[in-house]
């Protein structure tokens, strides 16, 4: 089996995390998974949604979008269509759920963190790149809250990262790019914390069901890849 990129089955694409990518947001990152590039920002807003007011806890929510020419052919902006696509809603809910597992909302106080993930170039794995980059932006936003004296306890509980795995030409592979994703027998997205806890698994067989052994092999690959991503996140935060 030869991957289109020439990578071995256990290899991530080249990963690059650039912090402070924009100047206004409390946390901002450009994350690159090969040719997939996503800008992730974390914005702090005083106050919480009405269903949480007066409870002394914070909130975290996420939005996701793709630039019209982030793909091979131009897409209309969702604002021009007048509604979000189901895929967009699904992905931004996934990002929000995943990153809420990273934070102690009680320690956040009555503050809201908005995560915005905007895909500027797509080559597969946009949701996994968004989650991985958004955590770094979140960490910077939390550091800002602490520096401003708006929180006293540590809100961050764990690091969160995500990667795709799949069965391509009968072989479990890590971090699928678009040519692999579009031809894969099985595609799975895994979100995990740096404590080894599993936060979410999304897996789909395209034609034939995958076996329990294949599932275990994919999960093992994902755990390995996410471990590498956690190291890259910490390296980015150290600079």
From Swiss-Prot:
Positions bound to phosphate: 87, 125-127
Domain of life: Bacteria
Listed Pfam families: RNase_PH, RNase_PH_C
GO molecular function, one term: 3'-5'-RNA exonuclease activity
EC class name: transferase
Keywords linked to the UniProt accession: Nucleotidyltransferase, RNA-binding, rRNA processing, Transferase, tRNA processing, tRNA-binding
GO annotation terms (biological process): rRNA catabolic process; rRNA processing; tRNA processing
SUPFAM superfamilies: Ribonuclease PH domain 2-like, Ribosomal protein S5 domain 2-like
Known EC number: 2.7.7.56
Catalytic reaction(s) noted: tRNA(n+1) + phosphate = tRNA(n) + a ribonucleoside 5'-diphosphate
PROSITE patterns, per the entry: RIBONUCLEASE_PH
Alphabetical list of CDD domains matching this protein: RNase_PH_bact
Biological role stated in the UniProt entry: Phosphorolytic 3'-5' exoribonuclease that plays an important role in tRNA 3'-end maturation. Removes nucleotide residues following the 3'-CCA terminus of tRNAs; can also add nucleotides to the ends of RNA molecules by using nucleoside diphosphates as substrates, but this may not be physiologically important. Probably plays a role in initiation of 16S rRNA degradation (leading to ribosome degradation) during starvation.
Family (UniProt): Belongs to the RNase PH family.
Subunit structure: Homohexameric ring arranged as a trimer of dimers.
Record-given protein name: Ribonuclease PH
Organism: Cellvibrio japonicus (strain Ueda107)
């Amino acid at each position: 089996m030869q991957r289109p990129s020439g990578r071995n089955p256990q290899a991530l694409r080249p990963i690059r995390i650039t912090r402070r990518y924009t100047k206004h947001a409390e946390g901002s990152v450009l994350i690159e998974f090969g040719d997939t590039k996503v800008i992730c920002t974390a914005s702090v807003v005083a106050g919480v949604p009405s269903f949480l007011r007066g409870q002394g806890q914070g909130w975290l929510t996420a939005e996701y979008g793709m630039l019209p020419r982030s793909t091979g052919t131009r897409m209309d902006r969702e604002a021009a269509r007048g509604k979000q696509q189901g895929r967009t809603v699904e992905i931004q809910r996934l990002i929000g759920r995943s990153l809420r597992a990273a934070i102690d909302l009680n320690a956040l106080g009555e503050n809201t963190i908005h995560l915005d993930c905007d895909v500027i170039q797509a080559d597969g794995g946009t949701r996994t790149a968004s989650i991985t980059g958004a955590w770094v932006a979140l960490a910077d936003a939390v550091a800002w809250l602490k520096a401003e004296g708006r929180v006293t306890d540590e809100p961050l509980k764990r690091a969160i990262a995500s990667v795709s795995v799949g069965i391509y030409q009968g072989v479990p592979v890590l971090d699928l790019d678009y040519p692999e994703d579009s031809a894969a027998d099985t595609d799975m997205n895994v979100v995990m914390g740096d404590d080894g806890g599993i936060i979410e698994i999304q897996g789909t067989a395209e034609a034939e069901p995958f076996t329990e052994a294949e599932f275990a092999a994919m999960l093992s690959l994902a755990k390995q890849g996410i471990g590498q991503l956690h190291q890259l996140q910490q390296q980015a935060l150290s600079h």
